[in-house]
Amino acid sequence: MKNMLLLSSSKYKNTGYLEHTLPWLQNFLADYRGKTIAFVPYAGVSRTFDEYEKTVQNALSDLGMNIVSVHHGKQHRDIIEQADVISIGGGNTFCLLKQLYEHNLIDIIREKVNNGTPYFGWSAGANVAGASIMTTNDMPITYPPSFQALQLFPHQINPHFISGKMQGHNGESREERLAEFLLVNPTALVYALPEGSALHIQNEMATVLGENPILCFSENMECGTFDINTTFSY
């Protein structure tokens, strides 16, 4: 059974790193205590892989699991193949996807998750689980071989969604950017995840977790809203 937890962000309001996600992760991974999580740190542009791994190990120590970054493997896919759970951290989605292709991890992650290995990711790690990364918010832009992502979730994801414009900001709002995307890609669906929200995916069903409803935008910016604790098919 496909089992994924897609988190909008690593923090919510004034909480510590991944602190608000711990109750969800403890429930999500209740049967995996003592098992191994393969962690993919590629999105962390401003820190080393070792630093990112240590940050996540400290934040998730209460899970009682062994968190190992893929960069410790002779081949990075070795760590993925041996792991009980797969996790991808947030940061820069372009850098993340580029290195997933470079290290030949796309197919092995897709295969394992489709065959029941639990997957969780936040921010870029949620974005890359979708159909493509074409609704990322990120800079700098590096060029992966394709914008097609893991396609574990068949639609677009936009993490860190904030509605409207900040005072003094004269550029496009997030809604305006997504409307432009849907003009160019009219058959797409975009799931917008506000801060502090998450989707728990089980096969073709999704449950909304967190503090804010999740939005789904389609052609002409038709908007569906999925309230907290709602379960829906996608």
UniProtKB/Swiss-Prot annotation:
Its EC number is 3.4.13.21. Its main location: cytoplasm. Transmembrane segments: none annotated. One of its GO terms (molecular function) is serine-type peptidase activity. It catalyses: Dipeptidase E catalyzes the hydrolysis of dipeptides Asp-|-Xaa. It does not act on peptides with N-terminal Glu, Asn or Gln, nor does it cleave isoaspartyl peptides. Signal peptide: none annotated. Keywords: Cytoplasm, Dipeptidase, Hydrolase, Protease, Serine protease. InterPro entries: Class_I_gatase-like, Peptidase_S51, Peptidase_S51_dipeptidase-E. The keyword Methyltransferase does not apply. The active site is at S123, D138, H160. It is an enzyme of class 3 (hydrolase). It holds the Pfam family Peptidase_S51. Belongs to the peptidase S51 family. This is Peptidase E. It comes from Haemophilus influenzae (strain 86-028NP).
